[in-house]
Regions:
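N-proximal low-complexity "stem/linker" segments adjacent to membrane-targeting elements
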Residues: 1-18, 25
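Conserved N-terminal catalytic core of the sugar/cofactor nucleotidyltransferase
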Residues: 2-5, 13, 31-103
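Conserved beta-strand segments of alpha/beta enzyme cores
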Residues: 24, 74-76, 152
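Glycosyltransferase donor-binding loop in the core domain
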Residues: 26, 84, 110
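Conserved core of the sugar-phosphate nucleotidyltransferase
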Residues: 111-162
Length: 162
């Protein structure tokens, strides 16, 4: 299974709050967010990890180059500034063909045990895709979904849709 990380944002909110590091390198419990995700992906059977970063991220690019040299699995880095996460997904799409994949943003926070259950369930399914969602919103531009009674996603929205 392939895993991909969108890490091409500007991190403008963090810098406004006085955080000097780029978002992927901000530490949670002593581990950079990007490292945490890659480690979790490896523990969940990743065959390959692909990360997209923007052109204005020399520290992140340097950090990922070090990780590539030490990686247990292929780690691809795409360097391209994109206007949105959807555009970043498009840039990653050639790397994600011919297998199931998991796509996330670098600042996704979750319990590893829940994530592992989610990934294992997806691996065992015949479904085209799964999407993990939450009702907790702390984002400048959240993405909302609508579902039917079977919890199948019926739409993606920029605002709450009833």
């Amino acid at each position: 299974m392939k895993f991909a990380i969108i890490s091409a944002g500007e991190g403008s909110r963090l810098s406004q709050e006085g955080v000097a590091l780029p978002k992927p390198l901000v530490q949670l419990n002593g581990v950079a967010m990007i490292d945490r995700l890659i480690q979790i992906f490896v523990r969940n059977g990743a065959d390959k990890v692909v990360v997209i970063i923007n052109n204005e991220s020399p520290l992140t690019k340097e950090h990922l180059a070090k990780l590539q040299a030490e990686a247990e699995i292929p780690l691809e880095v795409v360097v391209k500034t994109t206007p949105s996460s959807m555009h970043s997904f498009y840039e990653l799409s050639p790397y994600l063909q011919d297998d199931k994949f998991c796509l996330t943003t670098v600042d996704t926070i979750f319990r590893e045990e829940e994530f592992s259950t989610f990934i294992e369930t997806f691996k065992q399914s015949e479904t085209d895709g799964y999407m993990a969602v939450t009702d907790f919103i702390d984002d400048e531009k959240p993405l909302y979904i609508s579902t039917d009674s079977a919890l199948d996603i019926t739409g993606f929205h920029d605002a709450v849709s009833y």
